[in-house]
């Protein structure tokens, strides 16, 4: 082959390599789904930061927004969508951050399926602890106090751990070393417990996520009945996370059991609600799940570093 021909071949190879490199650089970023509601959006961003996909402005603290992402370490794009659609759309994303409220009904178990689990302290102040909320004027209501006391018992703690398989954790003191009375063999007896509201004081509690995510309130009802408290818990289900606070503010329900401390502060500030925490309930850690990849490293490899 003459020198001119060799030069042509070399130029062609160089051009092909350049085109390949350009194509790689121009490849569409892998999509990472996060909840689009305020508090969980922040949690999702923080979890993706912990996974090493992005860097976030430290000044944003626990509540970063998309604009606070300062660097994408890999060729990824963070995409907020409705939290309740994240499980059903998991296949459309490289990975998504999903909390237990929506993961449980979809059959996702953190210890089995999650690529990364949000780390949360089970004691002390935590902005993502779920709480029971009352109108501030009712914070000393004795009936409501009894409901919280019944929830924060060993039976309910055991039920949370056994029934939800590490998706929910108690956010109140309990004896971790005790021989649990609640087991896989009898947990269904508690979730299937039936009570009557005849002759009892009815307390309406707002929840989201369907019955399967709120069976701990059935365990709480059993505790109340065993104590002869004459209190009946009526769960009022809402389709959207922002509705229970409005309902309790309007007097349509008595308590709200579906929100974190961080969201409560934000929602009260935005809407002028006079609500307060009367008890901690559970911790539902956010997790990274994927149908396409079996590890965080596999996602990073597919995305490519930037």
Which residue ranges define each predicted feature?
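Beta->alpha turn/N-cap motifs
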Residues: 82-83, 91-94, 98-104, 210-211, ...
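Ligand-binding "clamshell"
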Residues: 27, 92, 106-120, 266-278, ...
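Short, well-ordered beta-strand elements
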Residues: 28-33, 198-211, 231-237, 306
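A bilobed periplasmic-binding-protein/Venus flytrap-type ligand-binding module shared by bacterial periplasmic
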Residues: 127-146, 285-299
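Short, polar/charged alpha-helical segment
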Residues: 46-54, 59, 65-67, 208-237, ...
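Ligand-binding clefts/hinges and TM-proximal coupling segments of bilobed small-molecule sensing domains
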Residues: 43, 57-64, 70, 145-191, ...
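A conserved helix-loop-strand patch within extracytoplasmic ligand-binding domains
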Residues: 27-51, 153-158, 278-306
């Amino acid at each position: 082959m003459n020198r001119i021909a060799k030069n042509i071949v070399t130029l062609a190879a160089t051009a092909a390599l350049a085109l390949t490199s350009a194509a790689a650089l121009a490849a569409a970023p892998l999509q990472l789904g996060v909840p689009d509601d305020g508090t969980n959006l922040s949690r999702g961003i923080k979890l993706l930061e912990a996974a090493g996909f992005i860097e976030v402005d430290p000044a944003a603290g626990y509540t970063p927004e998309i604009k606070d992402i300062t660097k994408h370490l890999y060729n990824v794009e963070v995409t907020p969508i409705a939290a309740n659609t994240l499980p059903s759309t998991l296949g459309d994303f490289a990975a998504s951050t999903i909390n237990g409220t929506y993961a449980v009904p979809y059959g996702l178990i953190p210890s089995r399926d999650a690529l990364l689990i949000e780390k949360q302290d089970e004691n002390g102040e935590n902005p993502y602890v779920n709480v029971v909320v009352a109108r501030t004027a009712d914070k000393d209501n004795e009936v409501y106090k009894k409901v919280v006391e019944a929830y924060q018992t060993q039976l309910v703690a055991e039920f949370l751990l056994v029934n939800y398989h590490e998706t929910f954790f108690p956010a109140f003191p309990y004896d971790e070393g005790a021989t649990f009375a609640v087991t896989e063999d009898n947990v269904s007896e508690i979730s299937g417990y039936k009570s009557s509201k005849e002759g009892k004081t009815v307390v309406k509690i707002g929840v989201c996520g369907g019955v399967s995510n709120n069976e701990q309130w059935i365990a709480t009802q059993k505790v109340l009945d065993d104590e002869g408290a004459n209190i009946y818990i009526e769960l009022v289900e809402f389709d959207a996370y922002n509705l229970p606070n409005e309902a309790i503010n309007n007097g349509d329900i008595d308590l709200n059991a579906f929100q974190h401390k961080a969201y409560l502060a934000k929602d009260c500030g935005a809407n002028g609600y006079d609500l307060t925490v009367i008890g901690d309930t559970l911790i539902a850690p956010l997790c990274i799940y994927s149908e396409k990849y079996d590890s965080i490293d596999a996602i990073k490899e597919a995305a490519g570093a930037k």
